[in-house]
Amino acid sequence: MDFKSKIRTVDDFPKPGISFKDITTLLKDGEAFHAAIETMAAHFEPLGINMVTGPEARGYIFASALAFRLRAGFVPIRKPGKLPWKTRSISYQLEYGEDRLEVHEDAFQPGQKVLVVDDLLATGGTIRATIDLVESLGAKVVGVAVLIELSDLGGRKRLEGHDVISLVQF
C-alpha cells in the first residue's frame, strides 16, 4: 500500500515554516490503518515481542494496536505527573529546552523483549529517551517501528544498534 498518499501535509502548521504530517487521514481509512499495523507486525512478529510501548500521545495509537496484534502487553510512556504510582523518569533535550518522560517503575521486567512504537521519527530525541527509559528497567528494546520518518533530520542515527522500520519517508 502507498501509505504516503494517505498522509496529508499541512504547511505552516503549527507555525510558519513547519510542514506538518497529518496522520488522521490514514487513521480514518480502515484499510490503510489495518495495513500499517499488519506491515509493522509482520516485520517484528518473529522476534517474540513481550511488550510494546510508545510515548504520549500519538505513539499510543500505533503502539496499542500493534500490541494487540502481537498479543503483547502495552505500556504507555507518559508526560510528567500523569502516573499514579512510583515512577522512573528521564530528561531529554529538545531543540529549545528540555522535556521528561515517565513510566511506572514496575512496567518492564528484566529480559522482556520490547518494541518501541511512535507515529513519527524526526530528530530521534523522544524515541532515544524512550529506549533509555525502558532499558534502565532491565528490559531489552529489540526494535523501533514508526509510521513516518523525516529522513533529513537524521533521527535514525540516534537509534543505531536497533532494528528500525518506517513505513513512509519524507
UniProtKB/Swiss-Prot annotation:
Gene Ontology CC terms: cytoplasm
Pathway named in the protein's UniProt entry: Purine metabolism; AMP biosynthesis via salvage pathway; AMP from adenine: step 1/1
Where it mainly occurs, coarsely classed, is cytoplasm
Task: Please give the InterPro entries that the UniProt record associates with this protein.
Answer: Ade_phspho_trans, PRibTrfase_dom, PRTase-like, UPRTase/APRTase
Q: Which SUPFAM superfamilies match?
A: PRTase-like
Q: Which GO terms label this protein's molecular function in UniProt? A: adenine binding; adenine phosphoribosyltransferase activity; AMP binding
Catalytic activity of the protein: AMP + diphosphate = 5-phospho-alpha-D-ribose 1-diphosphate + adenine
According to the UniProt entry, what is the EC number of this protein? 2.4.2.7
The GO biological-process annotations, alphabetized, read as: adenine salvage; AMP salvage; purine ribonucleoside salvage
User: Which top EC class is named for this enzyme in its record?
Assistant: transferase
Places the protein is found: Cytoplasm
Q: Which UniProt keywords apply?
A: Cytoplasm, Glycosyltransferase, Purine salvage, Transferase
Q: How does it assemble?
A: Homodimer.
- According to its UniProt record, which protein family does this protein belong to? Belongs to the purine/pyrimidine phosphoribosyltransferase family.
Xref: HAMAP family: Aden_phosphoribosyltr
Q: What does this protein do?
A: Catalyzes a salvage reaction resulting in the formation of AMP, that is energically less costly than de novo synthesis.
Task: Name the chain's protein.
Answer: Adenine phosphoribosyltransferase
